[in-house]
Amino acid sequence: MQGKIALVTGSTRGIGRAIAEELSSKGAFVIGTATSEKGAEAISAYLGDKGKGLVLNVTDKESIETLLEQIKNDFGDIDILVNNAGITRDNLLMRMKDEEWFDIMQTNLTSVYHLSKAMLRSMMKKRFGRIINIGSVVGSTGNPGQTNYCAAKAGVVGFSKSLAKEVAARGITVNVVAPGFIATDMTEVLTDEQKAGILSNVPAGRLGEAKDIAKAVAFLASDDAGYITGTTLHVNGGLYLS
């Protein structure tokens, strides 16, 4: 990955940060994005001279265009895109507000469309590109209270398979990494009883770690994975067996 330029959205903390750090450790120059200047500064601090943090609103097409122009001017064309930014707006469908549906779709699915599309011209010209979209186990299993989130993550899989077929002949791979239950800030607030309930369904007997996802992303971004495309790599300790 030496000399490659990677863009990782939503990399202030958790899985996104682990991905950014893993790619930079492999030699890539990583641009990580945050929704605020403070977040971008934090990314720049942990990446040091191996990358830079920048502000991006993934739901705003103009923000995306501005960011990509800045990256091109300052660093060059992007070789590796990791669409990691995502949110949750959980609710039972009967109670779900329209904005809870549309916010999820804009952030978790439409942003993948906009960013991936923006990469294609330069990647096709170079005949090289890696697009890695972060999905979720619930995109395959479903989850009550998350019809919006599950639909978006399932959509990411369908999008990735279709795009993979469109661009494979130009040396571009498009894959999904689908995490199971990963130990992050969000799982820290769970009670011991809630954690035990989750772990009872995980054959591996533990929550995953952010580095487990980062290692999977780094593999798919590498030259070793050049013949793998349109695939969903499930990283979930056996919670879901595809």
UniProtKB/Swiss-Prot annotation:
Gene Ontology BP term (one): fatty acid elongation
Residues of the active site: Y149
Binding-site residues for substrate, renumbered to this chain: S136
EC number: 1.1.1.100
Catalytic reactions of this protein: a (3R)-hydroxyacyl-[ACP] + NADP(+) = a 3-oxoacyl-[ACP] + NADPH + H(+)
Record has Oxidoreductase as a keyword: yes
Keyword Acyltransferase set for record: no
Gene Ontology molecular function, alphabetical: 3-oxoacyl-[acyl-carrier-protein] reductase (NADPH) activity; NAD binding; NADP binding; oxidoreductase activity, acting on the CH-OH group of donors, NAD or NADP as acceptor
InterPro entries in the record: 3oxo_ACP_reduc, NAD(P)-bd_dom_sf, Sc_DH/Rdtase_CS, SDR, SDR_fam
Pathway the protein acts in: Lipid metabolism; fatty acid biosynthesis
Record-listed NADP(+) binding positions: G10, S11, T12, R13, T35, N57, V58, N84, Y149, C150, A151, A152, K153, I182
Top class in the EC scheme: oxidoreductase
Keywords: Fatty acid biosynthesis, Fatty acid metabolism, Lipid biosynthesis, Lipid metabolism, NADP, Oxidoreductase
Domain of life from the UniProt record: Bacteria
A Pfam cross-reference name: adh_short_C2
Family according to the record: Belongs to the short-chain dehydrogenases/reductases (SDR) family.
UniProt function note: Catalyzes the NADPH-dependent reduction of beta-ketoacyl-ACP substrates to beta-hydroxyacyl-ACP products, the first reductive step in the elongation cycle of fatty acid biosynthesis.
Quaternary structure and partners: Homotetramer.
PANTHER family: 3-OXOACYL-(ACYL-CARRIER-PROTEIN) REDUCTASE, 3-OXOACYL-[ACYL-CARRIER-PROTEIN] REDUCTASE FABG
Protein name: 3-oxoacyl-[acyl-carrier-protein] reductase FabG
